[in-house]
């Protein structure tokens, strides 16, 4: 049923009151002035229905007279009149665009369903009560207030000192590293220790080649990488072994003679304790770590080995394991000043590990007979009280190993040549 606006219902009631039924009973039909009056209406009247009354709209209602007392001419005229009013009302509804406002369109979009969404609306609208908003606002305010009064002071009280200590620790390690490489840079020009560049490259690459050999043998795959790197390294194998033997003897000699106070620092001065605990030093030459470091404008290449202290106090749980139960007390470095690597590698340059291996091989090939100054540095692993010792002399061990040269003739024969 169509509901008419309030103003339209009032005007319809006034019209029906102005048209008396006396003139209709005389058979004259409508008043001659009725069409003019209807044309004068600004808005049309909705069509009448067969029910005796139109339902109420906003508290207003009106009622037509019974049509049984109206003549047939009047009924036909009334029917035409109501039909024209109905068409006019339809045009009015289209013009006014009832139930098609912007709010209605938004509501349709939010409530429309789609088969692609499981026959559910695209957007689900939640209604939040004002009580919930007030409660959430109060909770957030309470949390911020509690954080400000309790949590933040607690964080500053406990975690801020830890942050300061961590920053101090990082700076202290950086300072120790700078002091270490500063002493190395000072000692390199006046050292008496020498090493050929191919021997140094062999020290750097041999552990990598050895690991590749072990992996390829376990997996049953061709070790092309190791073969490619091992072409020139085989020639330096005996020289590398000779240098590692010298390194072991030289480190033990520095402890025996207490050079630079190294024995007193690591073992103390109690000879009775050495005998009682059966102190024994062991340098792990089978495992090393190759490193590149930049200090100021200089680049250092180094190979690092671990020095262990064995004693009765540190008995191994499993005797089959070589280094179990031994205490790692220091790192032994073999360091050279390396000019083969460009400085751009340390400034965010586009260099990879493959470039590192390539540079090592190219420098070995182009400088096969080049001799470089080197030093042996022993650095304790105690971070807070770290101390280092730099060895720059050959010692008795160097004099012994410097009396002969070792060269490999083929895969089976090795040649030892005494120097004059």
From Swiss-Prot:
Instruction: Point out the coiled-coil segments of this chain.
Output: none
GO-annotated cellular components: endoplasmic reticulum; mitochondrial inner membrane; mitochondrion
The UniProt record lists the keyword Membrane: yes
Give the membrane topology: Multi-pass membrane protein
Question: Which UniProt keywords are given for this protein, alphabetically ordered?
Answer: Membrane, Mitochondrion, Transmembrane, Transmembrane helix
The regions listed as transmembrane in this protein's record are 125-145, 149-169
Localization in the cell: Mitochondrion; Mitochondrion membrane
Asked if Nuclease is a keyword of the record, the answer is no
Give the note.
Present with 450 molecules/cell in log phase SD medium.
Q: What is the stated purpose of this protein?
A: Component of MIOREX complexes, large expressome-like assemblies of ribosomes with factors involved in all the steps of post-transcriptional gene expression.
**Subunit description:** Associates with the mitochondrial ribosome.
Protein name as annotated: MIOREX complex component 9
Q: Which organism is this entry from?
A: Saccharomyces cerevisiae (strain ATCC 204508 / S288c) (Baker's yeast)
């Amino acid at each position: 049923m169509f509901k008419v606006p309030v103003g339209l219902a009032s005007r319809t009631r006034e019209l029906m009151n102005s048209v008396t039924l006396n003139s209709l009973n005389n058979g004259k039909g409508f008043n001659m002035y009725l069409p003019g009056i209807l044309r004068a209406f600004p808005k049309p009247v909705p069509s009448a229905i067969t029910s005796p009354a139109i339902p109420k709209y906003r508290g207003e209602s009106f009622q037509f007279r019974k049509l049984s007392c109206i003549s047939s001419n009047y009924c036909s005229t009334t029917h035409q009149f109501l039909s024209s009013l109905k068409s006019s009302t339809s045009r009015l509804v289209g013009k006014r665009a009832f139930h098609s406002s912007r709010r209605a369109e938004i509501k349709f979009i939010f409530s429309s369903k789609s088969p692609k969404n499981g026959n559910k609306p695209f957007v689900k609208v939640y209604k939040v009560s004002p009580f919930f908003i007030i409660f959430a606002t109060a909770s957030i305010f309470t949390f911020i207030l509690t954080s400000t009064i309790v949590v933040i002071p607690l964080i500053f009280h406990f975690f801020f000192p830890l942050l300061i200590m961590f920053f101090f620790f990082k700076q202290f390690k950086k300072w120790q590293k700078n002091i270490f490489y500063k002493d190395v840079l000072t000692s390199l020009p006046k050292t008496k220790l020498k090493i050929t560049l191919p021997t140094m490259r062999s020290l750097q690459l041999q552990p990598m080649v050895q690991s590749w050999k072990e992996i390829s043998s376990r997996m049953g795959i061709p070790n092309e990488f190791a073969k490619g790197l091992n072409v020139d390294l085989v020639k330096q194998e005996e020289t590398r072994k000779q240098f590692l033997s010298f390194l072991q003897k030289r480190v033990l000699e520095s402890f025996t003679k207490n050079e630079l106070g190294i024995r007193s620092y690591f073992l103390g001065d109690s000879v009775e304790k050495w005998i009682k605990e059966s102190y024994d030093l062991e340098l792990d030459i089978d495992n090393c770590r190759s490193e590149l470091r930049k200090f100021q404008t200089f680049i250092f290449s180094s190979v690092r080995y671990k020095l262990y202290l064995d004693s009765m106090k540190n008995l191994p749980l499993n005797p089959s394991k070589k280094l179990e139960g031994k205490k790692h007390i220091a790192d032994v470095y073999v360091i050279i000043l390396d000019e083969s690597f460009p400085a751009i590698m340390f400034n965010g340059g586009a260099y990879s590990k493959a470039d590192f291996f390539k540079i090592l091989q190219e420098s070995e090939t182009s400088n096969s007979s080049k001799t470089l100054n080197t030093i042996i540095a022993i650095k304790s692993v105690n971070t807070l009280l770290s101390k280092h010792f730099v060895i720059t002399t050959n010692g008795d061990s160097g004099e012994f190993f410097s009396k002969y040269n070792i060269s490999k003739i083929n895969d089976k024969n090795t040649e030892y040549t005494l120097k004059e």
